[in-house]
Amino acid sequence: MNDFISSLNNWQALYALSNTMLSLANSGQWDELIEQEVKYVTLVEAIARNPIEPDNSVFQEKARELLTKVLANEAALKIKLQARMEELRVLIEQNGNQKSLVSAYGKLSGNVLMPNDFNQ
């Protein structure tokens, strides 16, 4: 019975942590979110090591409900992470463009160009 309770406690902790992670993503706290990922994986591993036995239908149903909620949070989190990855991709692209401009026009810095310089 204690193993069942321990396993169900892990499921509840996983759901609570998934709520926390989604909240962190919603508020843009990406570093904190990454820190929570390690705890999340550890809980998933603990659940895998200590599954709820098939003959305990009450605990299995509770775990199933929690799993459904966790999966919904994961789906929402995935959408947030994809949006963040797109933001970072745009920033990296802009940085690359800026470096190209600096490289191209930096060679001309310190030079005064006169209109007739372009005709030669």
From Swiss-Prot:
What does the sequence similarity comment in the record state about its family?
Belongs to the FliT family.
Chain ranges passing through the membrane? none
Q: Which GO terms describe its biological process?
A: bacterial-type flagellum organization; negative regulation of bacterial-type flagellum assembly; protein folding
Chain's role: Dual-function protein that regulates the transcription of class 2 flagellar operons and that also acts as an export chaperone for the filament-capping protein FliD. As a transcriptional regulator, acts as an anti-FlhDC factor; it directly binds FlhC, thus inhibiting the binding of the FlhC/FlhD complex to class 2 promoters, resulting in decreased expression of class 2 flagellar operons. As a chaperone, effects FliD transition to the membrane by preventing its premature polymerization, and by directing it to the export apparatus.
* InterPro entries in UniProt: FliT
Q: Where in the cell is it found?
A: Cytoplasm, Cytosol
Q: Which Gene Ontology cellular component terms are annotated?
A: cytosol
A matching Pfam family: FliT
| Residue span of region Required for homodimerization | 1-50
**Top-level lineage group:** Bacteria
Q: How does it assemble?
A: Homodimer. Interacts with FliD and FlhC.
Keywords from the named record: Bacterial flagellum biogenesis, Chaperone, Cytoplasm, Repressor, Transcription, Transcription regulation
Full protein name: Flagellar protein FliT
Q: Where is this region: FliD binding?
A: 59-97
